[in-house]
Amino acid sequence: MKKSNRTFSRALLIMMVLLNAGIFSCSNPKDKNKATLSSNSVNIQISYPTAQGDQPLDGRLIFLISKQIDKEPRFQLRDDSKTCQGFGMDVLDWKPNKPLQFDSKAFGYPIRSFDSLPSGEFFVQAVFHKYETFTRADGHVVKLPMDRGEGQKWNKAPGNLYSTPKKITISNGQFPNLTLKLDKKTPPIPQPKDTKYVKHIKIKSKLLSDFWGRDMYLGAHVLLPKGWETHPNVKYPLAIMHGHFPSDFGGFRTTPPDSSLKPEYSERFKVEGYNLTVQQEAHDFYKTWTGPNFPRVIAIKIQHPTPYYDDSYAVNSAAQGPYGDAITYELIPYIEKQFRGIGEGWSRFVY
């Protein structure tokens, strides 16, 4: 056991050294100048105008620093060695035109403090992730970010405030004084449109609304079998896809792959032209789904994000509430009634 602990500790130490050696993707690996910043040398003032709302806000304020500008810094913070730099603070009762300040004591990722940042040219941006106050049925009052149709992605959540990226220079360890205005707001996410085969539904859950003390919703993307509309008296089994938050019923494409599409490399799967493969597989699935020998069933992908995460894992829990019951006794019966499911336990399959 002691040997195992030593091995783990050594591996962890090596990993931390490697991560910090990279200085995140927004720095230049050749720049080793990390002059120490004095305790009073960081002064970053961030505020939002009254035009963004006149009520005090609760949430998380995130300050981002990136070397790259091919996309905004808010889309470059990630959980690997290619991340940009971020600093964050929890915020309560923040009023418009009242600046909040990041100073040298702010906690950062992946580099702990402003003191250790390298010199060079960077792009900075601030984002405010809004929280709501939930008065729950179990007596707890919590402040959390409500999902707004994005699948719990703080950098895409509608209604969040953010600033225009700004170029700065850190010279000889001196971080410039900054004043940033959160003058932009993330727009609503367009809802997917119904097609012949794919439908989209959303219901209010009484069970979840009672638990969370506000209106709570469940949704689903519904894939209908071939012949569904021409056989109005037929009832179908239900195949339930349980996974993370789906924005649509992906992997199903009625048209052939786009012949003008240029191959793209997938960093996740280490495959060149993965985007072409995705389109081809989606079209192949459509042909199989509508083929003469494929079983006629209804398939669904459910949307059940919580204030904590992009999905509830479809179970009841003390922390998240009765999601298992809400899906089983509210969402599934509603779908089966709307789209002529058989509605029996033996006719349902989770995959």
Go through the PLM ranges and name each one.
Residues 22-25:
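C-terminal motif of bacterial Sec signal peptides marking the signal peptidase cleavage site
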Residues 2-13:
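Bacterial N-terminal signal peptides that target proteins for export
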Residues 51, 67-107, 112-351:
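Non-catalytic cap/lid and distal C-terminal segments of serine-dependent acyl enzymes
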Residues 13-20:
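Hydrophobic helical h-region of N-terminal Sec-dependent signal peptides
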